[in-house]
Amino acid sequence: MDVKMHSSWKPILNEEFQKPYFSELISFVKSEYTTKVCYPKGNQIFSAFDHCHFDEVKVVIIGQDPYHGPNQANGLCFSVNDGIPFPPSLHNIFKEIETDLGKPMPSTGNLERWADQGVFLLNATLTVRQSEAGSHQGKGWEKFTDAVIKQISAEKENVVFLLWGGFAQKKAALIDSSKHHILKSGHPSPLSANRGFWFGNKHFSQTNDFLKSKGLKQIEW
């Protein structure tokens, strides 16, 4: 498995890489990718880390699990590969951006353009078996990604954390709110959004307002 991760993360996460659970996790993932169809592609598992260098993290969005349909997942939470129809949650994210910032729907759901600006798009579990949602949960990924969130919180300041839905909101316990900005809302999935828990949260303009107040470059959402 080709693990691709930008070098800026390696000193930050080296301690985790040495832990027994991480070795067991990587062995499990290698076995799964050898014997099953899994997503994202092996060389995209750590795409969030590769596109968004540690020194440049300004915003963190936390997802739960990669998409488990063919050609959807590309290693960035909520994002899909170019040419793939928008899944419902992603469509609702773009609808909120349209309302909040007046930006038209984009032509692609590939969020690499966000990641390259310092938006760290982290799924709690980084891999999944085809058509089996949650199939790689409880194997060590959550322990690893919790450690990533803690390290961002400890080593950086003035990061905006966007916590959408109950699962992501629990991660607030890992974040030092005295030096970071946490925004919470319902999940953008139709189940939540259509009940009034997503639309109108204005997280995208609020994020940019905060970044501007700290003298940081705003995100082109």
Curated annotation (Swiss-Prot):
<keyword id="KW-0378">Hydrolase</keyword>
<dbReference type="GO" id="GO:0097510">
    <property type="term" value="P:base-excision repair, AP site formation via deaminated base removal"/>
</dbReference>
<feature type="active site" description="Proton acceptor">
    <location>
        <position position="65"/>
    </location>
</feature>
<dbReference type="InterPro" id="IPR005122">
    <property type="entry name" value="Uracil-DNA_glycosylase-like"/>
</dbReference>
<dbReference type="InterPro" id="IPR036895">
    <property type="entry name" value="Uracil-DNA_glycosylase-like_sf"/>
</dbReference>
<dbReference type="Pfam" id="PF03167">
    <property type="entry name" value="UDG"/>
</dbReference>
<keyword id="KW-0227">DNA damage</keyword>
<comment type="similarity">
    <text>Belongs to the uracil-DNA glycosylase (UDG) superfamily. UNG family.</text>
</comment>
<comment type="function">
    <text>Excises uracil residues from the DNA which can arise as a result of misincorporation of dUMP residues by DNA polymerase or due to deamination of cytosine.</text>
</comment>
<dbReference type="GO" id="GO:0005737">
    <property type="term" value="C:cytoplasm"/>
</dbReference>
<keyword id="KW-0963">Cytoplasm</keyword>
<keyword id="KW-0234">DNA repair</keyword>
<dbReference type="InterPro" id="IPR018085">
    <property type="entry name" value="Ura-DNA_Glyclase_AS"/>
</dbReference>
<dbReference type="InterPro" id="IPR002043">
    <property type="entry name" value="UDG_fam1"/>
</dbReference>
<protein>
    <recommendedName>
        <fullName>Uracil-DNA glycosylase</fullName>
        <ecNumber>3.2.2.27</ecNumber>
    </recommendedName>
</protein>
<dbReference type="GO" id="GO:0004844">
    <property type="term" value="F:uracil DNA N-glycosylase activity"/>
</dbReference>
